[in-house]
Amino acid sequence: MNLHEYQAKQLFARYGLPAPVGYACTTPREAEEAASKIGAGPWVVKCQVHAGGRGKAGGVKVVNSKEDIRAFAENWLGKRLVTYQTDANGQPVNQILVEAATDIAKELYLGAVVDRSSRRVVFMASTEGGVEIEKVAEETPHLIHKVALDPLTGPMPYQGRELAFKLGLEGKLVQQFTKIFMGLATIFLERDLALIEINPLVITKQGDLICLDGKLGADGNALFRQPDLREMRDQSQEDPRAAQAAQWELNYVALDGNIGCMVNGAGLAMGTMDIVKLHGGEPANFLDVGGGATKERVTEAFKIILSDDKVKAVLVNIFGGIVRCDLIADGIIGAVAEVGVNVPVVVRLEGNNAELGAKKLADSGLNIIAAKGLTDAAQQVVAAVEGK
């Protein structure tokens, strides 16, 4: 679950980290009033969406008058911002962040993720702030400096100083950087985050460090113990189908194709999409129904897949390990009958009671195509889409 920039900065403030004074506004009038609270300009106005690349898309602007603030808010509030990180529809702009402009002398980067290879939280710092860190990692990886947090000791001040020295910081900037490093690490661990990022972390012309931007991603599996983060969730920024799937403990990611995929297991789901692509098809989604593929969850999965108007056929690929294929077949039959599926449905069952499951599908009288294997399933669903 991602947070908006203004929400990230609210958390920064709670932990004593420096950030520009700013206010999130939902109307042009609020935006003008926010400028008055901040004081004399210039100000920076930013569209609040869960996506990067806002500046290049016109969603961030430095303004010198309250009239310009009102015009920016009137132009963007209620609209959708399209960036290189969004789809063609973009993300809805429901809030504008108005904050004091900062005199920037230099831009840095500081962020942290959970590194699965080392099984630790790893902090990354770079002198190349203000640009996508992925681009820096690809083109100039030697400019990214890393430290890993020991799970027993947690973050240590010497690690912050080590990064500061590698960034070429001196004097009071080393102390300020270390404080920010320790604060970010504390936020990361106490708030069960999966990602935290300040890009850019700037050195002002006055010689101080300030968190000019903030990006936080919470671990969805830990939200049950982070009630204040749950309250910050903005479902308008999420795919409504993904949000509906999450309510049923289904993992759904929308794609651009026309073949709906329903699979149990993330690895099998990715393999299914690969083989569909291999045989000339285009997956419309990733959908993992998990180990407990009950009739109710299968029914809901069909509803979610078919809510995408692009879907011309559905491929159901189930391996019966934890669950029995005959019970899955009952769920598929009941779901197809209840939902009223009007597109071809190809089903491949393997594993526990697969033969009995295939027989139930064949005897159902419904328009369900039973596949003999994964390759056959991919070929049949692609042929069904092409009308062959």
Swiss-Prot record:
GO terms for biological process: succinyl-CoA metabolic process; tricarboxylic acid cycle. Gene3D superfamilies: ATP-grasp fold, A domain, ATP-grasp fold, B domain, Succinyl-CoA synthetase domains. It is an enzyme of class 6 (ligase). The keyword Transferase does not apply. GO terms for cellular component: cytosol; succinate-CoA ligase complex. Residues 9-244 form the ATP-grasp domain. Substrate binds at N264, G321, I322, V323. SUPFAM superfamilies: Glutathione synthetase ATP-binding domain-like, Succinyl-CoA synthetase domains. Mg(2+) binds at N199, D213. InterPro entries: ATP-grasp, ATP-grasp_succ-CoA_synth-type, ATP_grasp_subdomain_1, Succ-CoA_synthase_bsu_CS, SUCC_ACL_C, Succ_CoA_ligase-like_bsu, Succinyl-CoA_synth-like. The keyword GTP-binding does not apply. Its cofactor is Mg(2+). Binds 1 Mg(2+) ion per subunit. Pathway: Carbohydrate metabolism; tricarboxylic acid cycle; succinate from succinyl-CoA (ligase route): step 1/1. It catalyses: succinate + ATP + CoA = succinyl-CoA + ADP + phosphate; GTP + succinate + CoA = succinyl-CoA + GDP + phosphate. ATP binds at K46, G53, R54, G55, E99, T102, E107. Belongs to the succinate/malate CoA ligase beta subunit family. NCBIfam families: PRK00696.1, sucCoAbeta. This is Succinate--CoA ligase [ADP-forming] subunit beta. The lineage of its organism: Bacteria, Pseudomonadati, Pseudomonadota, Gammaproteobacteria, Enterobacterales.
